[in-house]
Curated annotation (Swiss-Prot):
The gene is prfC. The lineage of its organism: Bacteria, Pseudomonadati, Pseudomonadota, Betaproteobacteria, Nitrosomonadales. This is Peptide chain release factor 3. Pfam families: EF-G_D2, GTP_EFTU, RF3_C. Residues 8-277 form the tr-type G domain. GO terms for molecular function: GTP binding; GTPase activity; translation release factor activity, codon nonspecific; translation release factor activity, codon specific. Its main location: cytoplasm. It comes from the Bacteria. GTP binds at residues 17-24, 85-89, 139-142. It comes from Nitrosomonas eutropha (strain DSM 101675 / C91 / Nm57). The keyword Transit peptide does not apply. GO terms for biological process: regulation of translational termination.
Length: 535
């Protein structure tokens, strides 16, 4: 098989949503319909022995939430699908942001009862900024929900993109009868309890004018007919170019927990979602079909297998072909990486990988050699851009009861910090480490993982700082003068980038006014080399 052929059959996408919209359930059902698993994990009954395939971390199983990104690969209809299930909790949106830099499309899940929620909107803004194509799945039609016309209007108005319904619901809640497929002009009938693999086939009705059909579904069908006529007259025609530009979204309705509407979404991902495209590096644009391998680390996960205390670097292949045993260079350090134990994923389950192509996600065992946003090549000096680190919005100090466990604490925080799940800052003065995060749950997860994965009982307490800005200057001497004058407010992050800490935004404003030669940044990119200026 040629590289061109293999690239064309790749589909790499992320599933995004507000917490509790049903994202993890839909992930499970996509795996089920693609034949990757034979029984979907029960997301609802988390205390049972069966858990969602994509929720592998112990705290996820205990609390029934996704706090880490999972990667799953499967084959369906001749295509290789790389599915990335992102954290559902808003405190982990930074991890989700990085995942979105590794995909070519996104599947947005909306709770039909709640519409477009805050986390959904934030993630969609990221997709829009990157012109990522978006397919929308309106979930939970088997419950009492909002009027579908209102939902469509809200999606269009809030997200600022044209909406093209591909299916339309007939009723909802206890009177949910199915969906009408507007492209194929047929109705798929819903049956309660369709949550078993052997029940995934649905009854199809092609003639909605049949008196028996009208009698069977009554007023709900009549209302759906009127809405369908309205949609046909008002909704724009589907435009593949507009979809690929992130300006138009196909919309599907269904109930993921009942396996209903999932098949249509999976088929549309194969038919309409784009194969891997060009990727921007500082030096030039990289074509996916280039012969030489290139890839970027978008995620690092510690302790995927706690028995081995391992760390895996998740790499999005941007061009060329991966071959087991090939020599890859880490552009940042110039060091070579061994590739004899590179793996592919089905969540925490992995298999040794012989070959992979642009668009695929591979896992490279990492012993500190790789960092987030590292570029890997066959020798070319390239640096991919767009993988961000955001300034924390909450700070806490961390201490341990047993000083003899200090080494384990440092190891744990170093590895968890490399994941990007938490940011660890070393103060210029003093020895108490600072943890920075965008949400409180991140601290809970870190203390839980320190205890269960590193054997460290850690205590966190609110710090006096609430804001941070990375600082740079054109003149190194000026930056050193600023650091010397503000030693009590300076800390260094995982890549030793100097950071100014503040309790109030006014303190940053004063510093900016008093030090015009210093730049204050809300965001940094790889190794502290690229910054976005903002106060």
């Amino acid at each position: 098989m040629t590289i061109d052929h293999e690239v064309k059959r790749r589909r790499t996408f992320a599933i995004i949503s507000h917490p509790d919209a049903g994202k993890t359930t839909l992930t499970e059902k996509l795996l089920l319909f693609a034949g990757a698993i034979h029984i979907a994990g029960s997301v609802k009954a988390r205390k049972a022995s069966r858990h969602a395939t994509s929720d592998w971390m112990e705290i996820e199983k205990q609390r029934g939430i996704s706090v880490a990104s999972s990667v799953m690969q499967m084959e369906y209809r001749g295509c290789v699908i790389n599915l990335l299930d992102t954290p559902g909790h808003q405190d982990f949106s930074e991890d989700t942001y990085r995942v979105l830099t590794a995909v070519d499309a996104a599947l947005m899940v909306i709770d039909a009862a709640n519409g477009v929620e805050s986390q959904t909107l934030r993630l969609l803004q990221v997709c829009r900024a990157r012109n990522t194509p978006i397919i929308t799945f309106v979930n939970k039609l088997d419950r009492e929900v909002r009027e579908p016309l209102d939902l469509i209007d809200e999606i269009e108005r809030t997200l600022g993109m044209d909406v093209v319904p591909f299916t339309w619901p007939v009723g909802s809640g206890k009177r949910f009868h199915g969906v009408y497929d507007l492209r194929h002009e047929l109705m798929r009938v819903f049956r309660p309890g369709m949550d078993h693999a052997e029940q995934k086939d649905t009854t199809i009705i092609t003639d909605l004018g049949d008196p028996a059909v009208t009698k069977r579904f009554g007023a709900n069908l009549e209302q759906a007919r009127q809405e369908i006529d309205l949609i046909k007259g008002a909704a724009p025609e589907f435009d593949q170019a507009a979809f690929l530009a992130g300006q138009q979204t196909p919309v599907f309705f269904g109930s993921a927990i009942n396996n209903f509407g999932v098949q249509e979404v999976l088929d549309t991902l194969v038919d309409l979602a784009p194969p891997p495209g060009t990727r921007k590096a500082i030096q030039r644009e990289i074509l996916p079909t280039e012969n030489k391998f290139s890839g970027v680390v978008f995620k690092i996960q510690a302790n995927m297998n706690p028995a081995h205390r391992d760390r895996i670097a998740f790499v999005r292949i941007c061009s060329g072909e991966f071959r087991r045993g090939m020599s890859l260079k880490v552009v940042r350090s110039g060091k070579d990486v061994r590739t004899s134990t590179v793996v592919s994923f089905l969540s925490q389950r992995r298999e040794l990988l012989e070959t992979a192509y642009a668009g695929d996600i591979i896992g490279i065992p990492n012993h500190g050699t790789l960092q987030l946003a590292d570029t890997l090549t066959e020798g070319d000096n390239l640096q991919f851009t767009g993988l961000p680190f955001f300034a924390p919005e909450i700070f806490q100090t961390v201490e341990i009861a047993d000083p003899l466990r200090s080494k384990q604490l440092k190891l744990g925080l170093t590895q968890l910090g490399e994941e990007g799940a938490i940011q660890v800052f070393r103060p210029h003065l003093g020895s108490i480490l600072l943890l920075g995060a965008v949400g409180q749950l991140q601290f809970e997860v870190v203390t839980h993982r320190l205890k269960h994965e590193y054997g460290v009982e850690a205590r966190v307490a609110p710090a006096k700082y609430q804001l941070a800005r990375w600082v740079t200057a054109e003149m190194p001497r000026e930056l050193q003068r600023f650091i010397d004058a503000n030693t009590h407010r300076i800390a260094y992050d995982a890549v030793d980038a100097p950071t100014f800490l503040a309790s109030f935004s006014a303190e940053i404003s004063v510093a900016e006014e008093n030090w015009p030669g210093i730049r204050f940044h809300k965001m940094r990119e790889h190794a502290g080399l690229l910054f976005q200026t903002a106060s």
